[in-house]
């Protein structure tokens, strides 16, 4: 039975474990894109902040570009529907925000770092107390809560309790004119007059509005709008002299606050006289001398009731109805300071965020700096281009600027928050740098370029392929239809198409399946669903530009009996292929040509080598190799077997036949007898025992085609002999067949490997064509689909990531990653070196692989111990590149040497990300990154060269994660919090509770003085662990206090450490204080701690959690907040596990070294 015991193998050394912690760390950093299922919107005109709530309980706060804060509600009754954020209300100018959930729970949030922390919670019970509206006082001390029962409660924001008086609806009814005899219904809107803060405008559901005087607790004036059905809301002007009242029948009117009589246009319906839908939100302002009314809804119910519109009506007669393709959630209008002059309209839709310039009569669109809709058309593939050169990046920007000429140049109005000095300095220092560009392929045939180098995901270019295909007549008709649809008849609502979200695609064959992009030359290749490969580049200044070229390659033309039963190929427009046609250069991109692969099956993989002018594409039927410089085919190979061609045979099966299974059973019986009879065959020892492996189930016959090409790779490596590198193309299929093709390049392409071409379309000087031949073929025995191939050099760097002319340091090694295992081979012998069976050991399957670069600063002592390590590790300074013999000991400003290491990153079908060393394939990190149920997130994940990853956490959002400690991109902006007045008392109580257990008078005075001087908010005190520096080293205390103040002159060092801090432990210890035991020359083992602080030598030491190192700060964002922890005014201690090591060195001339470990457990309540 010992052979079934897993062998532990060789364990990493202590130095290696230290280095692993310095190199690898998993954390979720930033979120890009548009929030999934938004449900609420709020704007703070004082702090210039915007907040969005979602149906999943998320809250996102945005200020100036770079300021982003995230929060997440927690389950109350284990019902996800209760997480829906229904209302958001800012406490103006303080940075705090209130949220109301579907569970009728009111929560006060406060920004701490880059997160929002819930500090107060108030639940409401009963149907009559169902909250319908919120209004925060301009004095920042009260919140008025309107309910569906018609009552208004006052919430004291300092104590977060309901206080008197309550404005009951029956009290209000007693003071309104007797002509109003209805039950007023729910509170629809509450507004405080800006010129008279003791007066409230209250709008009830059934056509009643009152002006309430809070000093006298009486109705000062009543406004009755009969005949309009339900009221919806109010909008008060900046001077507090008039208000706009809008209703559910599509009407609105402007009332004077000093006059209760209805205005003359009280029956005005903008889109009447037909019955109209409700106006959901309305703002009124001015543009010069003209009044501007902005409202959502109000469409004629029968004709245009299904339109999602926001209308802008100006008193000079100009009207625009912005017609969106998704539901309008909410919107707001920004004004100039202290006036009613409108500036910007910001509309939150179900699928996107749109902004418009209201100062311009043409109401131009504004390009927002964030919250872009990644899924304007459904995303079909992702490609992440790392280390894009600045020259290529600038060319993409110039092309994108040509597309942005129709946008307004007005400044973005949301400018709240403060950017830290680090983020500002880094932007100024890095003048020349590499960029990270995310390319998303879409269902409509477009490819969008996103700059994801920093926290902001900025759209920089949109490449469209749909205009190439189709006939000319259809294309012209579509263009005419788009122009005519801009405006309808004058008698109808003046519709204008608005927004970018377009979920519909004219032709599913246009969908982009694979993308290849060269970060050094800017060459772009796009593969589609119908076997089309579009070749383009960003060099529009080339002199030899010609008309669009077209070519096709048939994979099964020489095979008899094959019948393609799928969709037809796309037709290139005939006018583009004429000899006198102008070059297809649009918006800064030159489209060179189109390659059509036949049969027109979907492109399953692509590889691009711009220096050689080659592109290779794979389908379910085989692969093609194409020379796009000369635009001629080079090579094609069909991977189908005869059974697949005729359809008579089944797909490749991994099930054993009955004859083979019976034969193996008899062999096992014979082998078992011989083993029992042979005493020399002993059971291996524990160290030699093989690990227990899961049985790999045979794949069923309905698996994917074994002929499908899964991955392609261009590499210049050692194939024929050990001394000379040769250009090669590697391919792999679903049936574990790896083929190596030797490429014969003419002199021009060979020279291009040493000198990069100036553009992607420079034709070769020689007339000799490129040729390819099959050199080697590898058949893996387990026959699992191959998901990735990579060739790396001695330092572990992939050779395909090198610049032109660099081959890497020999020897080269080949990594083949199938769904079940990794295998490393030597080159050119192709001898197995190492392997890692993931499915057998872990039960997971490999989905994606990538090589990443990891680096950190290390001490010279650690450097010496690493000199004898793996050859794939190196130590280098800032100015050195990747290569062999690149080991140096250059120290930068005394911070240590820059240690560099290449590693293999792997994503599994369980959503886990593993980091493995190469070529040893030893696991360095394993993190659960994506939920295993999130199939879309797992399939969309892509890695960068610096150990980062992006995946789609929803159909519209991207989550960024970091695996390296040296490259972490996360929001650095903060929101300054204005302290509440009542926090002085709470802070004093915190200090007093600490003084009760402290007998050192001087220390007490220092604590009290510090607290009284700073007066920090309670939430800031409670969340101080969030302000940790993840790179801080361990803190060493001498006798628990500083060296200079130590009363004990003996040379004793006490180091206190706490075990692994997890999210669960920190959740229970948000306000934990750890107490260190102080000792002199006598020690004893302490079984438990019965007091909150221990005194020795008349000195008590308290260490806050900020002194505890190695806390993963971004993981604290996922903490489930406890409402009861925010209600207490004392600081309690909870110690789970404290390990105290006391080390005695030479004392009083005696040489002695004694170590005592004390483990203490204590539990207390908050």
UniProtKB/Swiss-Prot annotation:
Phosphorylated by aPKC which restricts l(2)gl activity to the oocyte posterior and is required for oocyte polarity formation. It is found in: Cell membrane; Secreted, Extracellular space, Extracellular matrix. Expressed in the epithelial cells of the digestive tract and in gonads, in the ovary's nurse and oocyte's follicle cells. Keywords: Cell cycle, Cell membrane, Exocytosis, Extracellular matrix, Membrane, Repeat, Secreted, Tumor suppressor, WD repeat. GO terms for molecular function: GTPase activator activity; myosin II binding; syntaxin binding. WD repeats lie at residues 39-72, 82-128, 131-167, 189-223, 231-263, 278-320, 328-358, 380-464, 513-595, 604-665, 709-779, 788-833, 838-928, 942-965. Essential for the development of polarized epithelia, for cell polarity associated with asymmetric cell division of neuroblasts during development, and for oocyte polarity formation. Promotes the formation of actin-rich projections at the oocyte cortex and the posterior enrichment of par-1 which is required for oocyte polarization. Regulates the localization of axis-specifying morphogens such as stau and grk. Could act as a tumor suppressor. Belongs to the WD repeat L(2)GL family. May form multimeric complexes. Interacts with mahj. Interacts with aPKC; the interaction results in phosphorylation of l(2)gl. Interacts with ball. This is Lethal(2) giant larvae protein. It comes from Drosophila pseudoobscura pseudoobscura (Fruit fly). The gene is l(2)gl.
């Amino acid at each position: 039975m010992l052979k079934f015991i897993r062998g532990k193998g060789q364990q990493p050394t202590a130095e290696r474990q230290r280095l692993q912690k310095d190199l690898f760390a998993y954390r979720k950093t930033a979120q890009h894109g548009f929030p999934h299922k938004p449900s609420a919107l709020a704007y703070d005109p004082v702090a210039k902040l915007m907040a969005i709530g979602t149906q999943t309980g998320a809250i996102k706060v945005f200020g100036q570009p770079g300021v982003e804060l995230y929060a997440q509600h927690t389950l109350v009754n284990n019902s996800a529907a209760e997480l829906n954020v229904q209302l958001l209300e800012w406490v103006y100018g303080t940075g705090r925000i209130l949220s109301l959930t579907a569970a009728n729970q009111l929560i006060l949030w406060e920004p701490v770092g880059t997160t929002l922390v819930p500090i107060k919670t108030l639940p409401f019970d009963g149907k009559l107390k169902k909250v319908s509206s919120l209004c925060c006082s301009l004095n920042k001390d009260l919140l008025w809560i309107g309910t569906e029962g018609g009552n208004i409660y006052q919430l004291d924001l300092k104590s977060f309790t309901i206080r008197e008086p309550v404005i009951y609806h029956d009290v209000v009814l007693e003071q309104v004119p007797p002509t109003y005899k209805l039950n007023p219904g729910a509170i629809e809107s509450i507004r405080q007059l800006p010129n008279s803060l003791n007066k409230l405008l209250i709008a009830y559901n059934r056509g009643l509005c009152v002006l309430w005087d809070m000093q006298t607790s009486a109705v000062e004036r009543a406004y009755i709008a009969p005949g309009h059905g339900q009221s919806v809301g109010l909008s008060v002007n900046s001077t507090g002299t008039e208000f706009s009242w809008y209703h559910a029948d599509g009407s609105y009117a402007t009332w004077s606050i000093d006059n209760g009589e209805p205005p003359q246009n009280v029956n005005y319906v903008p889109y009447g006289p037909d019955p109209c839908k409700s106006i959901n939100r309305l703002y009124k302002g001015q543009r010069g001398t003209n009044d501007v009314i902005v409202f959502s809804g109000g469409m004629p119910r029968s004709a245009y009731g299904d339109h999602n519109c926001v209308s802008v009506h100006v008193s000079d007669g100009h009207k625009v109805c912005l017609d969106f393709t998704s539901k309008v959630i909410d919107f707001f209008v920004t004004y100039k300071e202290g006036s009613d002059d409108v500036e910007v309209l910001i509309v939150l839709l179900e699928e996107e965020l749109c902004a418009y310039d209201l100062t311009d009569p043409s109401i131009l669109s504004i390009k927002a700096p964030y919250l872009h809709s990644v899924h304007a058309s459904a995303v079909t593939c992702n490609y992440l281009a790392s280390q894009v050169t600045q020259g290529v990046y600038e060319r993409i920007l110039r092309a994108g600027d040509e597309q942005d000429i129709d946008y307004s140049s007005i400044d973005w109005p949301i400018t709240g928050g403060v950017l830290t000095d680090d983020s500002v300095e880094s932007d100024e220092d890095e003048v020349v740098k590499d960029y990270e560009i995310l390319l998303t392929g879409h269902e409509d045939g477009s490819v969008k370029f996103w700059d994801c180098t920093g926290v902001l995901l900025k759209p920089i270019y949109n490449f469209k392929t749909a205009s190439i295909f189709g006939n000319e007549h259809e294309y012209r008709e579509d263009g005419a239809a788009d122009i005519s649809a801009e405006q309808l008849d004058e008698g109808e609502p003046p519709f204008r198409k608005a927004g970018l979200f377009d979920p519909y695609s004219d032709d599913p064959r246009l969908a982009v399946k694979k993308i290849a992009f060269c970060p050094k030359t800017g060459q772009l290749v796009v593969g589609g669903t119908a076997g089309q490969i579009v070749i383009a580049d960003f060099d529009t200044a080339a002199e030899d530009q010609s008309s669009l070229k077209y070519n096709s390659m048939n994979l099964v033309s020489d095979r008899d009996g094959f019948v393609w039963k799928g969709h037809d190929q796309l037709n290139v427009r005939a006018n583009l292929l004429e000899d006198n046609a102008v070059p297809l250069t649009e918006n800064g991109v030159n489209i060179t040509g189109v390659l059509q692969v036949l049969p027109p099956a979907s492109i399953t993989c692509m590889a691009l080598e711009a220096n050689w002018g080659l592109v290779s594409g794979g389908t379910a039927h085989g692969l093609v190799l194409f020379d796009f410089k000369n635009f001629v085919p080079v090579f094609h190979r069909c991977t189908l077997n005869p059974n697949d061609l005729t359809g008579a045979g089944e797909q490749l099966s991994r099930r054993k036949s009955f004859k083979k299974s019976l034969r193996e059973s008899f062999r096992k019986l014979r082998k078992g007898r011989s083993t029992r009879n042979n005493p020399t065959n002993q059971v291996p020892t524990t160290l030699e025992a093989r690990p227990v492996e899961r049985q790999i189930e045979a794949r069923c016959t309905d698996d994917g085609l074994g002929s499908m090409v899964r991955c392609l790779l261009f590499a210049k490596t050692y194939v024929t002999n050990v001394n000379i590198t040769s250009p090669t193309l590697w391919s792999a299929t679903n049936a574990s067949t790896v083929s190596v093709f030797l490429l014969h390049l003419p002199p021009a392409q060979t020279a291009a490997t040493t000198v990069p071409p100036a553009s992607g379309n420079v034709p070769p000087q020689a007339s000799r064509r490129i040729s390819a031949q099959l050199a080697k073929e590898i058949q893996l025995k387990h026959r699992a689909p191959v998901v990735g191939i990579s060739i790396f050099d001695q330092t572990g760097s992939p050779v395909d990531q090198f610049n032109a002319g660099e081959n890497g340091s020999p020897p080269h090694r080949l990594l083949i990653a199938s769904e079940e295992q990794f295998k490393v081979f030597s080159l050119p012998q192709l001898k197995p070196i190492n392997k890692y069976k993931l499915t057998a050991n872990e039960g997971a399957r490999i989905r994606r692989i990538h090589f990443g670069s990891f680096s950190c600063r290390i001490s010279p002592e650690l450097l010496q111990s690493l000199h004898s390590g793996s050859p794939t590790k190196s130590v280098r300074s800032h100015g050195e590149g990747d290569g062999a013999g690149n080991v140096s000991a250059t120290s930068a400003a005394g911070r240590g040497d820059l240690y560099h290491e290449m590693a293999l990153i792997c994503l599994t079908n369980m959503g886990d990300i593993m980091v493995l060393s190469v070529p040893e394939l030893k696991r360095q990190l394993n993190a659960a990154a994506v939920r295993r149920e999130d199939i879309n997130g797992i399939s969309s994940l892509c890695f960068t060269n610096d150990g980062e990853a992006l995946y789609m956490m929803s159909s519209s959002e991207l989550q960024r994660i970091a695996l390296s400690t040296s490259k972490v991109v996360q929001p650095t902006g903060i929101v300054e919090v204005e302290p509440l007045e009542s926090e002085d008392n709470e802070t004093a109580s915190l200090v007093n509770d600490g003084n009760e257990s402290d007998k050192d008078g001087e220390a007490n005075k220092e604590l009290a003085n510090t607290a009284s001087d700073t007066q920090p908010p309670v939430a800031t005190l409670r969340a101080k662990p969030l302000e940790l520096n993840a790179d801080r080293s361990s803190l060493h205390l001498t006798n628990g206090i500083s060296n200079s103040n130590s009363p004990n002159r003996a040379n004793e060092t006490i180091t206190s450490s706490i075990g692994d801090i997890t999210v669960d432990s920190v959740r229970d210890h948000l306000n934990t204080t750890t107490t260190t035991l102080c000792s002199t020359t006598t020690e004893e083992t302490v079984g438990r701690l019965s007091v909150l602080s221990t005194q020795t030598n008349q000195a008590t030491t308290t260490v806050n959690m900020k002194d505890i190192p190695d806390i993963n700060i971004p993981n604290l964002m996922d903490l489930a907040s406890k409402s009861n922890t925010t209600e207490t005014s004392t600081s309690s201690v909870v110690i789970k596990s404290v390990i105290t090591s006391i080390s005695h060195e030479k004392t009083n001339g005696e040489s002695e070294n004694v170590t005592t470990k004390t483990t203490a457990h204590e539990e207390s309540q908050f």
